[in-house]
């Protein structure tokens, strides 16, 4: 039943009666309609008056019905319409749904005359189609839009086409130039006592029947006007013939959408319709059927949908403004029946009339709304507020693009600011700390209007401090919150709070009286809400007033420290008071004076930004003494002042003692002038010699034409044969840039290299600071076949760099890695590394994961002889880590650095930490980087222990205690006890001001130990995490981090002048005539003068050479012994314990090449170097430079580290840079027994093994060849025992042999396995031991964890001999007799375990001992 469809709970009799009365009314008016048509749309006066009278009465019934009647009016007065429950949060259509309009029920429910049906068809509707379920769901899922837009569109629109319906109001209107409209009443409100209809519909909330042109589809969804924007004109519908076919066709046509039309128009062809027009309508409806479903809705949600109420005042205000506009549009819409404008015989199109009458602004609003995506059916109040305000703020735009793109960000920001500011006030009032944190995190202080008072004259900080909410107040203070400017005094604050309390009480009293009087009206619920809100606000204001009355002034700040930070600046740091006396401190005052009693202030500073409790006083007079004090402030006023510690200070700097200037002053300007002179010289000499620059390139192209005959373009190198290459590593996070052949971009420099490779490499590193000038250098460089080999090799480097730039499409190739990579095939790889901000698309490259690239490369590599490219991929993680860490800078402060060098054949290396390779080993002294004049004079005056005692008693010099702490920390970092550092010195010639407010004091070793020569013994072994970096590379990365502009200019000048010196020298040699000789000599002299000027500037800035000069002096010149600062007798001397595998250089250093360096002798192990026995562990070198001088960061680590660190290292090493090809299984000899070869030799570790309770004295270390059948050759140490695992074998014994199930860190040493490792230390037990079986002491380490110190992890291997007994005495005897004991090398100082020297000659070392060294390296 149709009546049951719209009102399922209404009885059918009442609806049927309404239909019959509607039919009677329509038949009476039918003759008038025909007369209007015959009279060319000129109505008769009586009929016109009759229609207008009926429309006027209907409008009067809507507008003037009293509130007390059973049918409340649609539009209330200004005071009444806001009192409807939920009106503040619901839309206008929900307000309209409260109206019944029972007086217009008959007119609304009259049957349609357009498509007459039988009585049965009038009272029934077809069931809802399943095809439109998706469309209905989409329509309901769309977010409800602004109701004002919908109503405004209803006001401006013309007639819409409606499908045939059994309930269709008919209104004939005469022709008029001004169109009129009418709005019919909804269906009567359903009665709950009535039965349900027979049609089954989906259970979903629907909008009640209400005026405004709403339509319903078969499933109960509301159809908005704009959903029918492309429907055909009304005249086409009116021309349906009255036949039986219409009864069957129309229900099928409108099965998806059964609308209810409330306003229609009719023209002269109301009762005439032809079959042609019928079919045109059907075809047009079928074409637009899907299009109608996809248009976004502009209507409002139903009254039964639940909405989240907004408690915000600004939200309610915005909605009321929106309601006023909607009501105004609605009132304008209640007019007499509208008449269509146009000539007779033409139907008015919806699109034509709508586009004419709708303003440009409304078009933009409609387009903007139609672009919005689907959202929840019931948005929150914040979202509705956002939509309402965004449309009001948008204004008029010329086009949709302007409205949507250009104005959208401003509107969103403005609306967001209003919402966030209001939300912040509510969160502070409700004491919601989480909400305040979220708002402060998402918005800035300006966006929140953090310091803008609200209507009550309060800021969020005022509310938080007067309610004594300390956490929220501190958050607001850190965000930059301030108090209200209205509170100029205590009296004004008190009066303001009292006024707020009185106002809240008055409003609460008035609302209470209104609620009592109007307890039965509709306004009661809203009044009660307002009453509760004002009562709560009254309590809030009373609490704020009570908090203000009980608060007191704050106490003095704590820990006020005064420091000298420059020649004209002082810095004060402090902490907040211990007790704030029930009030949060909002600001501090810093005062300084030249008088101790502060009777005359030199200045003061108010600190309101409390993010950092630190203040810097600038503009002071150098050399004048200043006293400083600090006081705190809260809402009750200023508290007492606190003097600083020390109470006074003199602005000064350490350079004020002798008047020296800074190292970097004026050097940058001088280098810029020198660079301009060099460029001018190049232009002068290159202008006349252009022909010489073209001939070599032409000859080169001819000579290389045959080689590149079948190569159309230059490409990357796929495989290394022999020569020098440049590899460019571009990375982003864990991805590398590779070529289309999945290779790292590599180009060839030359097919061979000379003995000056190291000098060429250093020049290439300088070239990395001027990649953009490569083309200019190539053009100005004229190289002939008679040129020197150095000049030719550098010209080839320039050509290769330019080629790589062209292939990659970028000038910047990155920084050069600190050493080249070499292999046994005669290849040298120069690596440049650059970090990319994103995965930038390259024309000749793509991005690939590092792990994937390594796994692909391992299948192609040669197991016996790894190439330089293989070594690059193996150590790629270390290279990238070095690149990242070398760009980090230290924070501002004063540091204590440790200067230690080691020399090799052709270079000097500096000890640096791996975590920061651009700086010496260091520890922080303090945050203040400046050293004052008084502190520097105190350091210079130290001349003996008497001075130390005097300085120790003096409380004024804080630098003394800071230096003591820093020295102990640095010595502990390098694993050196105090008694062994008694010869160390403090460098006092200068304070190294490195830049970026970072300064250094240097700690120097003894004069003989400053630089360790090759073969020199190591007095101590530092902790892991250090590397030896070449001095030139250290200076490059150091200055690139701290003096970027200086090093860039220096590298430009140095690289250009080096080339110019070679060119002018070659020209001078080739000169024949006197004029040529004179010109060449003059030019060469100019270049030499430039080089001399550059070297002078470089020496002034190069601080490390000056420090080395003073460090080698044995006389106390420029340094102070640390024994005058630190008492070395505090720690008793302890003898350290070493092992044979700790006989390495000073520290392990990383290297991209997997080569093992020579075993250096130590005092306790070997008296001489093992040149013959260790010759096989080196890769042969073709020049005097060998990359094996600097080992990999995964090198020997013989000092203690925790189990967590070791396990982390193991995971990182084996899963990071090294692919699976590097993870070996076993270490076996090919001449061993078959059982040994077939059985895997597992490697176990002993963690936290303590040997302090024993006296380990190993006088002889028997070789493992005693239990081997035959000692193998030195070149056959690794065996391919596992057929499924590929690895590098042969002489490359730097690969760590690992078990597949056990993967410890590669940086840990491997030792001779004990025969009975599983033996407990208390209970004797003897068990047979297999040569291929190993055991661990892990189960017995827990009882001794607390009583015995920790020793680093030790690897043990099995042996053929078993211990006869496992009790502790026999074990000690075995250890004393020299049986296979595990020597705990690198034990921490203070342990009682010792070891005597082992005199093992190089010839007596067996292959098994060599394998220990090899397996302990990377």
Swiss-Prot record:
- Please report the stretch or stretches of sequence annotated as the Fibronectin type-III domain: 556-652
Quote the disruption phenotype from the UniProt entry. Inactivation of ankfn1 produces vestibular defects in fish larvae.
- What's this protein's function? Required for vestibular-related functions.
Q: Does the keyword Glycoprotein apply?
A: no
The Gene Ontology CC terms held by the record are:
spindle
> Which gene underlies this protein?
ankfn1
Query: Which Pfam families is this protein grouped with?
Result: Ank_4, fn3
Biased composition regions of type Polar residues, renumbered to the chain: 144-154, 1136-1146, 1407-1418
Q: Where are the ANK repeats?
A: 419-450, 456-485
Name of the protein in question: Ankyrin repeat and fibronectin type-III domain-containing protein 1
One GO BP annotation of this record = establishment of mitotic spindle orientation
Keyword Repeat recorded: yes
Q: Composition bias, kind Low complexity: at what positions?
A: 171-186
Alphabetically sorted, this entry's keywords are: ANK repeat, Repeat
Region annotation (Disordered) ranges: 119-236, 1134-1179, 1321-1343, 1361-1418
InterPro entries, A to Z: ANKFN1, Ankyrin_rpt, Ankyrin_rpt-contain_sf, FN3_dom, FN3_sf, Ig-like_fold
Ranges annotated as biased composition (Basic and acidic residues): 223-236
Q: Which species does this protein come from?
A: Danio rerio
Stretches for region Highly conserved peptide sequence: 893-900
């Amino acid at each position: 039943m149709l009546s049951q469809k719209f009102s399922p709970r209404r009885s059918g009799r009442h609806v049927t009666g309404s239909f019959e009365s509607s039919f009677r009314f329509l038949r009476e008016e039918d003759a008038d309609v025909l007369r209007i048509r015959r009279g060319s749309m000129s109505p008769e006066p009586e009929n016109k008056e009759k229609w207008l009278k009926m429309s006027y009465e209907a409008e009067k019934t809507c507008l003037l019905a009293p509130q007390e009647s059973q049918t409340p009016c649609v539009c209330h007065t200004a005071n009444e319409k806001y009192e409807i429950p939920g009106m503040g949060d619901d839309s206008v259509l929900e307000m309209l749904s409260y109206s019944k309009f029972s007086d217009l029920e008959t007119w609304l429910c009259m049957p349609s005359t357009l498509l007459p049906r039988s009585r049965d068809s009038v009272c029934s509707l077809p069931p809802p189609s399943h095809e439109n379920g998706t469309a209905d769901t989409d329509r309901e899922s769309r977010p409800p839009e602004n109701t004002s837009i919908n109503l405004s569109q209803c006001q401006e629109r013309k007639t819409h086409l409606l499908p045939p319906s059994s309930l269709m109001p008919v209104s004939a209107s005469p022709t008029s130039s001004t169109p009129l409209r009418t709005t019919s009443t909804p269906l009567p409100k359903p009665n709950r006592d009535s039965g349900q209809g027979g049609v089954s519909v989906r259970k979903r909330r629907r909008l009640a029947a209400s005026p405004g042109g709403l339509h319903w589809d078969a499933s109960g969804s509301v159809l908005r006007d704009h959903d029918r924007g492309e429907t055909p004109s009304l005249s086409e519908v009116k021309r349906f013939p009255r036949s039986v076919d219409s009864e069957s066709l129309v229900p099928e046509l409108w099965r998806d959408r059964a609308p209810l039309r409330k306003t229609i128009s009719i023209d002269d062809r109301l009762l005439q319709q032809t079959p042609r027009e019928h079919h045109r309508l059907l075809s047009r409806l079928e074409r637009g059927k899907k299009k109608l479903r996809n248009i976004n809705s502009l209507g409002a949600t139903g009254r039964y949908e639940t909405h989240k109420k907004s408690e915000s005042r600004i939200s309610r205000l915005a909605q009321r403004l929106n309601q006023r506009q909607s009501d105004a549009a609605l009132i304008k819409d209640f007019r007499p029946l509208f008449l269509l404008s146009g000539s007779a015989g033409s139907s008015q199109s919806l699109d034509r009339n709508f586009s004419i009458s709708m303003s440009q602004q409304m078009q933009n609003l409609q387009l903007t709304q139609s672009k919005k995506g689907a959202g929840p059916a019931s948005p929150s109040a914040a979202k509705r507020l956002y939509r309402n305000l965004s449309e009001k703020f948008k204004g008029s735009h010329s086009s949709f693009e302007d409205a949507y793109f250009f104005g959208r960000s401003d509107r969103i920001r403005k609306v967001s600011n209003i919402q966030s500011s209001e939300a912040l006030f509510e969160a502070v009032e409700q004491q919601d700390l989480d909400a305040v944190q979220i708002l402060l995190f998402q918005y800035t202080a300006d966006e929140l209007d953090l310091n803008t008072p609200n209507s009550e004259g309060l800021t969020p900080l005022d509310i938080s401090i007067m309610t004594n909410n300390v956490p929220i107040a501190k958050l607001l203070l850190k965000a930059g919150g301030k108090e209200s400017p209205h509170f100029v005094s205590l009296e004004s604050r008190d009066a303001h709070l009292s006024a707020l309390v009185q106002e809240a009480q008055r409003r609460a009293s008035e609302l209470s009286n209104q609620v009592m009087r109007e307890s039965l009206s509709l306004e009661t619920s809203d009044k009660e809400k307002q009453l509760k809100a004002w009562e709560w606000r009254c309590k809030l204001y009373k609490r704020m007033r009570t908090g203000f009355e009980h608060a007191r002034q704050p106490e003095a700040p704590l820990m006020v420290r005064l420091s000298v930070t420059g020649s004209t600046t002082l810095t004060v740091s402090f902490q907040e008071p211990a007790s704030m006396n029930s009030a949060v401190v909002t600001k501090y005052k810093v005062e300084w004076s030249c008088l101790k009693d502060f009777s005359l202030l030199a200045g003061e500073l108010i600190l309101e930004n409390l993010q950092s409790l630190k203040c810097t006083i600038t503009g002071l007079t150098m050399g004048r003494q200043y006293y400083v004090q600090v006081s705190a402030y809260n809402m009750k006023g200023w508290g007492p002042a606190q003097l600083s510690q020390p109470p006074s200070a003199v602005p000064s700097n350490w350079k004020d003692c002798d008047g020296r200037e800074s190292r970097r002053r004026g050097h940058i300007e001088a280098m810029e002038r020198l660079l301009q002179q060099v460029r001018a010289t190049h232009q002068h000499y290159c202008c006349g010699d252009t022909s010489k620059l073209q001939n070599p390139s032409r000859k080169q192209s001819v000579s290389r034409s045959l080689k590149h005959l079948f190569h159309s373009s230059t490409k990357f190198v796929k495989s290394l044969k022999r020569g020098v290459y440049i590899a460019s590593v571009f990375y982003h996070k864990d991805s590398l840039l590779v070529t289309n052949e999945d290779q790292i971009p590599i180009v060839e420099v030359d097919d061979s290299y000379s003995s000056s490779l190291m000098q060429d490499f250093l020049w290439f590193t300088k070239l990395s600071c001027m990649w953009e000038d490569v083309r200019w250098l190539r053009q100005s460089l004229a190289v002939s076949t008679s040129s020197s080999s150095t000049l030719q090799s550098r010209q080839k480097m320039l050509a290769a760099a330019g080629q790589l730039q062209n292939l990659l499409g970028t000038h910047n190739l990155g920084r050069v890695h600190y050493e080249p990579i070499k292999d046994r095939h005669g290849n040298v790889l120069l690596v440049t590394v650059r970090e990319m901000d994103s995965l930038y698309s390259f024309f000749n490259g793509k991005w690939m994961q590092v792990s994937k690239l390594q796994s692909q490369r391992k299948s192609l590599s040669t197991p016996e002889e790894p190439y330089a490219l293989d070594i690059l991929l193996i150590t790629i993680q270390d290279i990238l880590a070095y690149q990242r860490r070398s760009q980090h800078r230290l924070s501002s402060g004063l540091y204590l650095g440790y200067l230690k060098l080691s020399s090799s054949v052709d270079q000097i290396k500096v000890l640096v930490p791996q975590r920061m390779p651009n700086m010496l080993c260091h520890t922080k002294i303090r945050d203040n980087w400046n050293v004052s004049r008084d502190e520097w004079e105190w350091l210079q005056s130290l001349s003996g222990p008497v001075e130390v005692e005097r300085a120790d008693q003096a409380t004024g010099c804080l630098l003394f205690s800071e230096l003591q702490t820093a020295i102990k920390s640095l010595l502990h970092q390098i694993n050196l006890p105090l008694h062994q550092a008694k010869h160390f010195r403090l460098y006092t010639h200068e304070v190294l001001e490195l830049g970026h407010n970072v300064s250094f004091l240097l700690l120097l070793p003894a004069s003989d130990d400053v630089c360790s020569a090759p073969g020199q013994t190591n007095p101590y072994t530092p902790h892991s995490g250090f590397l030896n970096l070449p001095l030139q590379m250290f200076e490059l990365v150091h200055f690139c981090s701290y003096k970027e502009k200086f090093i860039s200019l220096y590298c430009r000048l140095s690289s250009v002048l080096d080339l110019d010196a070679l060119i002018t020298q070659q020209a001078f040699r080739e000169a024949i005539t006197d004029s040529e000789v004179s010109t060449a000599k003059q030019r060469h002299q100019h270049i030499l003068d430039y080089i001399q000027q550059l070297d002078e500037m470089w020496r002034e800035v190069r601080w490390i050479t000056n420090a080395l000069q003073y460090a080698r002096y044995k006389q106390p010149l420029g340094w102070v012994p640390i024994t005058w600062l630190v008492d070395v007798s505090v720690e008793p001397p302890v003898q350290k314990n070493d092992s044979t595998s700790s006989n390495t250089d000073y520290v392990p250093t990383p290297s991209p090449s997997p080569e093992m360096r020579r075993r250096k002798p130590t005092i306790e192990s070997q008296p001489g170097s093992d040149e013959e026995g260790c010759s096989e562990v080196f890769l042969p070198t073709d020049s005097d430079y060998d990359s094996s001088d600097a080992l990999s960061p995964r090198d020997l680590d013989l000092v203690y580290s925790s189990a967590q660190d070791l396990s982390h290292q193991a995971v990182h090493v084996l899963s990071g840079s090294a692919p699976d090809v590097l993870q070996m299984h076993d270490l076996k000899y090919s001449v061993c027994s078959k059982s040994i070869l077939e059985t895997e030799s597992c490697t176990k570790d002993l963690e936290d093994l303590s040997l302090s309770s024993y006296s380990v004295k190993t006088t002889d270390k028997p070789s493992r060849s005693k239990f081997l059948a035959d000692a193998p050759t030195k070149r056959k140490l690794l065996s391919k025992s596992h057929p499924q695992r590929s690895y590098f074998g042969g002489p490359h014994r730097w690969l760590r042999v690992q078990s597949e199930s056990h993967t410890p860190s590669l940086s840990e040493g491997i030792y001779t396995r004990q025969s009975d490792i599983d033996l407990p230390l208390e209970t004797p037990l003897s068990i047979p031991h297999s040569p291929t079986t190993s055991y661990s002491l892990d189960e017995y380490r827990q009882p001794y964890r607390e009583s015995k110190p920790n020793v680093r992890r030790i690897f043990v291997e099995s042996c053929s001999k078993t211990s006869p007994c496992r009790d502790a005495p026999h074990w000690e005897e075995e250890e004393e007799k020299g049986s296979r004991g595990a020597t705990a090398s690198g034990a921490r100082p203070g342990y009682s375990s010792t070891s005597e020297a082992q005199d093992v000659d190089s010839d007596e070392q067996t292959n098994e001992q060599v394998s220990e060294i090899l397996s302990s390296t990377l």
